[in-house]
């Protein structure tokens, strides 16, 4: 976690302004939210993961690769997937002949076994298709459209913190706030059933190189 701008707790809009003001890097810094959850990530039933479509997008193109066969290949191409292929593409990935410079990988249920052969390559990059993220589906066109409209995935880390991008410093405060609220709402919907009391411990907003700010309690 980046150091705090101050020990003050801000309302979300003021916090966003402070983060943007403190971003001094010579590139367009991203703006992220970090949500410290009152969970035990070592327990499988308290792990938090999900997807959310950012209403104002990420401010950049989201790239998608699709592993499939037969007619699903053409479906993926028509839906404007960036990389499309079957077993041949899998072999290229194994041999490092294809650099998967993408944000998401999708496949169909009948092709999942083939994709599993490159799980050790996709997994560490966070690209392994997963039914929980709706990235193992026969409805490829629908999934690709959803992703490219601004869908992101989130997952609690081993310390119980969820990190998610909500845009960059060139976004308007209003657009960042709308994306922020979408992420907060999605994480709340993923609250484990075993958590009966406090769910959000702390919420911070951070830019890539700038300092972070703590924002007001958002448990309600």
From Swiss-Prot:
One of its GO terms (biological process) is regulation of translation. Keywords: Repressor, Ribonucleoprotein, Ribosomal protein, RNA-binding, rRNA-binding, Translation regulation, tRNA-binding. GO terms for cellular component: large ribosomal subunit. The keyword Ligase does not apply. The keyword Ribonucleoprotein applies. InterPro entries: Ribosom_uL1_bac-type, Ribosomal_uL1, Ribosomal_uL1-like, Ribosomal_uL1/biogenesis, Ribosomal_uL1_3-a/b-sand, Ribosomal_uL1_CS. Belongs to the universal ribosomal protein uL1 family. Binds directly to 23S rRNA. The L1 stalk is quite mobile in the ribosome, and is involved in E site tRNA release. Protein L1 is also a translational repressor protein, it controls the translation of the L11 operon by binding to its mRNA. Part of the 50S ribosomal subunit. This is Large ribosomal subunit protein uL1. The gene is rplA.
